[in-house]
């Protein structure tokens, strides 16, 4: 190898190289001139600068021998290894210090309130285009959520299931029997059969046939009560003490509005309008109202002669509109039925059908206490006129006609104390225009005026002017809307000593003595005493007068065949059930409802038996239909179709139509409350296990439906429930945004009275209600030792994090990593505003009512929680929800848990630049200067180094342990090689 150049030689070489490069681009000089320039440069004296000396030193190092170069490389590598090792060691020491630093404290119990100002554009009324900005102030109420958990109402009751019982039922449908009952013609019989076949075929096409285990039927005979109640539940017979009808052909009832179409207020149809005497302007010559309406006035009400018959001795009525307040329409039909039957039994005189005097109001009998029937009020005459005309013992006239009670235009101000000096001051200008005046003014006489010899079409002038324009004058006066000259007169109609009997009680008593068929036939005939059955009339008008009826009626002798029960197992797909009912003497129009009793082999409280399922037979006619014999042909078919379609729909939905099965015996045997029975009815399921046609002809058809029921028996019902919404808390830790939650052991909070229970549900199904196999009562989370120790989990989330969820009460659930509208960051809050405002890019609207304070029940124990400092890094490294601590750990336990978690993650390996950034993030809260330096190194390695060497640098860091081992081996080998190069003795050259 040639020796290196001296400093002067290197400077001359450098100068000559620069001169050659400069002359190559010059074209104005000749070759001789260029040679002369080079010669001149060679003879110039050059003084070396410091930079030249440094550059020469670098040249001399590279131009020396290979041994010297290797020594230089070795020293550089060793220095680099020492530097990196020291840096990594310092970073790891800082990392361990970061772990031991106390973390943040989370305390959710904070409430805030803020008033923010927003600019809104307001448009003036005079200008459509110009909008002016106005300042509005919006109140934002924020309520913290304890433990990051929101409780919202859980409307569905939760049922802890005790067991499930099974029941089977066979339903028979026979069109011929329905047709005979409704007196259908042959054409309508064909239509009825086609309709039944269509519905049943539709059901059969969606159901498969299969067998279920069935036992012997054990029947409950409730036929007498069912048929008697169905026909005569609200039917009564009242007997007068003396025969006396309504004393006049008219009734003054100004409290009732008048008929007609009026533009301002439309009143519902009043039944007394049927007796209204209308005004007609055109009448024949000499016409007067007395000739046609007797004492009734034009614009008043005329009572026909059949309603004021003086020979009436009894009143027969079938209506539930005269019962007292005990008959609450909000109750179910079953509850009203049971209540009525109990009252009738308690009020009956011995075993007779006559009721005690206290059942009636005092107006009917002096000993009356209105235990069953109420007192007739003033407005009853408007909608129930027949009840008033036939049952009232006295009547108070309500009149606003001039001349009644001696009031005229001259003394009208004396009729009411509020009308005194009415026209002598300005008082009349401030009152209602109807005040202190009559509804109908009396004229001198009633007359007709004819012109030009016309005798058939004359102008009629009644004695009282017509009131149609003031159709509700009297009704408003009755409501005391204004002072008026009301004339109230009491007139006695008949003596108040009535005797009353119940047709339902008579039916029950007669069915025991003469049989149910005989009792039904005789009492139905009695209801048809006047030619029209009373129980067919509308309930408001089902009141008729009778003259000396025979009661109790004569009961005919009806023979019935009877046979013993067939205990053999039911034969499938046969008419055996139909024949069994026939042999027992029950007609399909009123077949006995034979109800199965549940027996469970695991419950000795119930009736003993070995079969879980019991079979019973029921027919469509008596189970769901009303008496179609009172309907016309097409109406009866439509009625049957409605019930049949409803039955099919319920079966397809696997629901139970409880009109086909009575549940009172279920309640008695299971000993359940009314609320529990409501749940049993709602949660019960049905399954059709066969549908078959037993007979068919062009005009008749019959079907059988086998139905299996599953009844859920509740063990406990949780009604007042709250559902848990685990919102959590946001945490900015070590440069990472983390979503922290307390993992609560319950999903539902139940609060009954003052007791709060925390429920954990397992194996639940949601069918209208939530039905669960397992409901565990657990302890809530809290700092007290006796409470549950719940894990706290953390999950890394991206920033910015904004969660806005509207609640059903009009408020908003907000969890955000930023602050807006004075809503705090990181803390879950329930926000309520009083005006529309836009926050976090979402419009917040006010609730339906002003809410200044929001309270959520039930309350949970207070929870104050300290988390590890590196919670965000731990969650970030695993990128999934992990457990970072528990609710009862102290800070020492939390630090140990964090160390163990970080060591287990082995964060020192892997992507070295990313690890340095993690160290910088963890150090930023503890040592900002060191964090900046470490962050800079990490950015250099990830950005600059990546730009120079590409992704290979990052990939090599993942193989760092292997590369370090290989590098150490190579360095040792190189060291021995260099030592071998060292000379043992000086060489001559």
UniProtKB/Swiss-Prot annotation:
Residues 89-961 are lumenal. It comes from Simian foamy virus type 1. GO terms for cellular component: host cell endoplasmic reticulum membrane; membrane; viral envelope; virion membrane. InterPro entries: Foamy_env. The gene is env. Keywords: Cleavage on pair of basic residues, Glycoprotein, Host endoplasmic reticulum, Host membrane, Isopeptide bond, Membrane, Signal-anchor, Transmembrane, Transmembrane helix, Ubl conjugation, Viral envelope protein, Virion. It comes from the Viruses. Foamy viruses are distinct from other retroviruses in many respects. Their protease is active as an uncleaved Pro-Pol protein. Mature particles do not include the usual processed retroviral structural protein (MA, CA and NC), but instead contain two large Gag proteins. Their functional nucleic acid appears to be either RNA or dsDNA (up to 20% of extracellular particles), because they probably proceed either to an early (before integration) or late reverse transcription (after assembly). Foamy viruses have the ability to retrotranspose intracellularly with high efficiency. Envelope glycoproteins are synthesized as an inactive precursor that is processed by host furin or a furin-like protease to yield a functional hetero-oligomeric complex. The transmembrane protein and the surface protein are N-glycosylated. The record marks 126-127, 572-573 as: Cleavage. Residues 577-599 are annotated as: Fusion peptide. Residues 1-65, 983-989 are cytoplasmic. The ER retention signal plays an important role in establishing the intracellular site of budding. The mature envelope protein consists of a trimer of SU-TM heterodimers. The N-terminus of leader peptide specifically interacts with Gag protein. This specific interaction between Gag protein and Env glycoprotein may allow particle egress. It holds the Pfam family Foamy_virus_ENV. There is a cross-link at residues 14-15, 34, 53 (Glycyl lysine isopeptide (Lys-Gly) (interchain with G-Cter in ubiquitin)). Glycans are attached at residues 109, 141, 183, 309, 351, 392, 411, 424, 490, 509, 528, 557, 783, 809, 834. Signal peptide: none annotated. The chain crosses the membrane at residues 66-88, 962-982. A motif (Endoplasmic reticulum retention signal) lies at residues 985-987. This is Envelope glycoprotein gp130. Residues 1-15 are annotated as: Involved in virion budding. The surface protein (SU) attaches the virus to the host cell by binding to the cell receptor. This interaction triggers the refolding of transmembrane protein (TM) and is thought to activate its fusogenic potential by unmasking its fusion peptide. The transmembrane protein (TM) acts as a class I viral fusion protein. Under the current model, the protein has at least 3 conformational states: pre-fusion native state, pre-hairpin intermediate state, and post-fusion hairpin state. During viral and target cell membrane fusion, the coiled coil regions (heptad repeats) assume a trimer-of-hairpins structure, positioning the fusion peptide in close proximity to the C-terminal region of the ectodomain. The formation of this structure appears to drive apposition and subsequent fusion of viral and target cell membranes.
